[in-house]
């Protein structure tokens, strides 16, 4: 995205020197941002400012409205893995000045584009894949089912087509999620429950789960539910409750068991230790008792959906 702008300035507010830029008023902040980037302030240049981990600076959140009002020529994207937890800290985003969007894993169409199959992507999106291209399309879909859609994993796979080389990508992601427990767990018990989820919860992907004693643990439904909802606010997973009615409005039954969907099939494959089964499967629909196919369908349902409140349903 940055390549589409004349000027691209990335900031990461986990770095103290970047976070300190927002300790001043909007004019001083903008001036220092450009000085740090060693770029002149030029209103004629299309400029993108990318602020990562914005949850680390309430001041940066507050200044977003002034970028909108006083510096409309600077396009601002703010990202963070824990944005919804800011609401619990009574840190509010400027009303009417910020558009909320969720960032999803790459879709199959994105995977095709990244791996040099852009023309085939058009055929797939237009539902016009003919018999001659069917086998190649299914082979690529099998690769996508194995790799998943995490951007770094897709980019690395596009370079070398080596699934083993992706292990450090998945490892790093899983380790970072585990390390982030300290940021969003309120109590020691919640830390332990979340660690259990991040260690053992992947094998329950797409299953209807019972919260009490989940994953053969001794944790109560209240403790497990609180931990799951905390991870849900980070978009790492989603609890999807069933719909039982035949008529509109379709309302989820929260008294019934929810299904657990994780962020990405590639992470599930790695964390649940089923990569080998996926790699040598002749039929994705049968792989892992059909659970992988359901995870992939759930992901594709979200592709292209950027509304932060979008959720999936299932019917029983």
Model-derived segments and their meaning:
Residues 50, 75-81, 102, 111:
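Structural recognition of the conserved hydrophobic beta-strand(s) that form the central parallel beta-sheet
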Residues 41-60:
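Conserved P-loop NTPase "ATPase switch" module shared by AAA+ and STAND
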Residues 17-22, 54-64, 88-89:
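Conserved ATPase-coupling elements of RecA-like P-loop NTPase cores
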Residues 11-45:
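Short glycine-rich substrate-engagement loop in P-loop NTPases that contacts/grips substrate
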Residues 1-7:
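P-loop NTPase Walker A phosphate-binding motif
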Residues 70-91:
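Sensor-1/coupling segment of RecA-like P-loop NTPase cores
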């Amino acid at each position: 995205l940055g390549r589409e702008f004349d000027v691209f300035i990335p900031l990461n507010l986990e770095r103290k020197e970047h976070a300190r830029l927002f300790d001043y008023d909007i004019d001083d902040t903008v001036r220092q941002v450009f000085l740090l980037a060693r770029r002149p302030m030029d209103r004629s240049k299309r400029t993108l400012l990318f602020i990562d981990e914005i949850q680390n600076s309430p001041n940066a959140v507050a200044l977003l409205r002034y970028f909108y009002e006083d510096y409309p020529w600077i396009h601002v994207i703010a990202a963070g893995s824990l944005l919804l937890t800011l609401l619990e800290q009574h840190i509010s985003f400027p009303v009417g000045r910020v558009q909320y969007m969720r960032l999803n894993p790459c879709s199959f169409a994105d995977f095709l584009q990244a791996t040099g199959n852009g023309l085939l992507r058009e055929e797939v999106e237009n539902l016009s894949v003919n018999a001659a291209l069917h086998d190649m399309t299914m082979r690529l879909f099998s690769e996508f089912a194995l790799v998943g859609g995490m951007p770094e994993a897709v980019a690395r796979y596009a370079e070398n087509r080596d699934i083993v080389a992706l292990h450090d990508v998945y490892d790093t992601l899983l380790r970072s999620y585990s390390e982030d427990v300290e940021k969003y767990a309120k109590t020691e018990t919640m830390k332990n429950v979340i660690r259990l989820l991040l260690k053992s919860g992947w094998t329950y992907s797409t299953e209807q789960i019972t919260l009490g004693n989940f994953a053969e643990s001794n944790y109560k439904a209240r403790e497990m539910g609180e931990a799951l909802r905390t991870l849900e606010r980070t978009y790492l997973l989603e609890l999807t409750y069933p719909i039982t009615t035949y008529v509109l409005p379709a309302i989820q039954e929260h008294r019934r068991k929810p299904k657990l969907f994780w962020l990405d099939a590639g992470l599930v494959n790695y964390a649940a230790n089923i990569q080998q089964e996926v790699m040598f499967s002749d039929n994705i629909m049968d792989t892992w008792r059909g659970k992988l196919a359901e995870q992939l369908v759930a992901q594709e349902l979200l592709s292209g959906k950027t509304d932060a409140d979008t959720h999936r349903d299932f019917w029983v």
